[in-house]
Amino acid sequence: MAKSKGNREKIKLVSSAKTGHFYTTEKNKRNMPEKMEIKKFDPVIRQHVMYKEAKIK
């Protein structure tokens, strides 16, 4: 039998600088039910900005 993937869900991290840049990652919904916010590098404006979680369509 194949092993289940579990509670990990793919998410998109969208730049708060409104550049349209985003990262994709996975997170465990059981351990982290709140929306993820993380500071990452935005190569469009070449600065570190806050990235906020959005659903992948």
From Swiss-Prot:
Mind telling me which Gene3D superfamilies this protein's record contains?
Ribosomal protein L33
Q: SUPFAM superfamilies attached here?
A: Zn-binding ribosomal proteins (SSF57829)
InterPro entries hit by this protein: Ribosomal_bL33, Ribosomal_bL33_CS, Ribosomal_bL33_sf, Ribosomal_zn-bd
What Pfam families does the annotation carry? Ribosomal_L33 (PF00471)
Which molecular-function annotations from GO does this UniProt entry contain? structural constituent of ribosome
Q: Per the UniProt entry, what are the Gene Ontology biological process annotations, in alphabetical order?
A: translation
Q: Which GO terms describe its cellular component?
A: cytosolic large ribosomal subunit
UniProt keyword annotations, A-Z: Ribonucleoprotein, Ribosomal protein
Name the PROSITE patterns for this protein: RIBOSOMAL_L33
Question: Which superkingdom?
Answer: Bacteria
Q: By its UniProt entry, which NCBIfam families does this protein fall under?
A: PRK00595.1 (NF001860), rpmG_bact (TIGR01023)
Query: What protein family is recorded?
Result: Belongs to the bacterial ribosomal protein bL33 family.
What protein does this entry describe?
A: Large ribosomal subunit protein bL33
Look up and give the organism this protein is from: Shewanella sediminis (strain HAW-EB3)
- Organism lineage: Bacteria, Pseudomonadati, Pseudomonadota, Gammaproteobacteria, Alteromonadales
